[in-house]
Amino acid sequence: KLSRLEADVVEFDEKDILLSEIVAEAADNVMALCDLRDVRLSIDEGSDKDASIHADAYWQCEAITNIVKNAVEHAESEVRIGFYRYEMYAEITVQNDGETISDEDKKHIFTRFYSGSGQPADSIGIGLSLAEAIVRHDNGYILVEDCKKDILKDTLNEKNECSGTRFVVRYL
């Protein structure tokens, strides 16, 4: 898929799509992995149900699924997804309560075939690279940040602390 995108041979079926539909399908796509890893997946109730973007639903679902899958693989017990519409952009957030990503790994996380420290042995480093290429095609970008208390409306664990990683997918 990534090679086809890079070769510019993919035909996109772009139309207005709801972020809620992308997120729901991505969540469905990773439920078996969540069950296997005993990770709870939740969607922020404060999300904007009417938030939409102009993009290809299939490919955006592929991108978000890859990001959510990564978050689940590195979560301790929970992954949360939110989606919002602002005046200048729309945004999907995916955050977990696992280990943070090192600054060195953040520099390369979207590089094809890059497997950062702490990656499973069977990781080939394509998923996040593919996600970034898809989002970029639709005039977006992905931020990766450490999850801090001020990012969350409430915390992911009982100690009133937040750890983990947050992916912010922003569409302009």
Locations of the language-model features?
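Short conserved segment of the HATPase_c
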Residues: 101-114
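Short alpha-helical Gxxx[C/S/T] motif in the catalytic ATP-binding
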Residues: 127, 131
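Conserved micro-motifs of the catalytic ATP-binding
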Residues: 7-12, 50-55
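Short conserved segments within the C-terminal catalytic ATPase subdomain
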Residues: 8, 33-43
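Short beta-strand/loop element within the Bergerat-fold HATPase_c
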Residues: 78-88
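A conserved beta-strand-to-alpha-helix junction within the catalytic ATP-binding
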Residues: 13-28
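Glycine-rich ATP-binding loops of the HATPase_c
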Residues: 139-158
